[in-house]
């Protein structure tokens, strides 16, 4: 591993531990040339997933796009960084466990909405309004009406 301070390639590992719920390894290293200490993360390299956009274009899966969308949808709610990372980790895990290595962006959006529905209704509506390209209040009303039966069922199961 190349030292960020002196670019020497000789270092020793001082400490290793699991990170990201076991999906990566965090290593604390020390450069053998300048004694600079730095941290590295190792992650299993997975098969790339292609995303088929609405326009028909293809691009590689980019988790930061989901994180950015969730950050906007969850702004001023109680959902913050670690929960957003968890949602994206779960979606990415589902994608990598799937047989197909190409997925439509619409399917990814639905996966995000499935997670948000259980966590925060406001974030769900915000994400849905952008993802489903709402054109007016009727689109909001339809989505809100679709959420109502779910809440009634949850209340009935508690009673």
From Swiss-Prot:
GO terms, biological process: negative regulation of DNA-templated transcription
Domain of life per record: Bacteria
Feature: compositional bias, Polar residues: 1-11
Keywords attached to this entry: ATP-binding, DNA-binding, Metal-binding, Nucleotide-binding, Repressor, Transcription, Transcription regulation, Zinc, Zinc-finger
PROSITE patterns (UniProt xref): ATP_CONE
Cofactor note: Binds 1 zinc ion.
Keyword Flavoprotein: no
NCBIfam families named among the record's database cross-references: transcriptional regulator NrdR (TIGR00244)
Family: Belongs to the NrdR family.
Name of this protein: Transcriptional repressor NrdR
Organism: Prochlorococcus marinus (strain NATL2A)
